[in-house]
Swiss-Prot record:
Annotated HAMAP family: Ribosomal_bL33 (MF_00294)
Family: Belongs to the bacterial ribosomal protein bL33 family.
Gene that this sequence comes from: rpmG
UniProt signal peptide: none
Natural source organism: Thermobifida fusca (strain YX)
Lineage, top ranks: Bacteria, Bacillati, Actinomycetota, Actinomycetes, Streptosporangiales
UniProt name for this protein: Large ribosomal subunit protein bL33
């Protein structure tokens, strides 16, 4: 049942250091592509681009 979930849990990883810093949910119907957000990376200690990982 989790495979057909409309709002699955996704992980956001920093593009610079590749650390997985955030876990969130997204609506698959509204955003079918990979999610990209600018969030704070505690490892880099600055705001960086975070991309959805699988």
């Amino acid at each position: 049942m989790a495979a057909t979930d409309v709002r699955p849990k996704i992980t956001l990883a920093c593009q610079e250091c590749k650390h997985r810093n955030y876990i969130t949910r997204k609506n698959r119907r509204n955003t079918p592509d990979r999610l990209e957000l600018r969030k704070y990376c505690p490892n880099c200690r600055t705001h960086r681009e975070h991309r959805e990982t699988r």
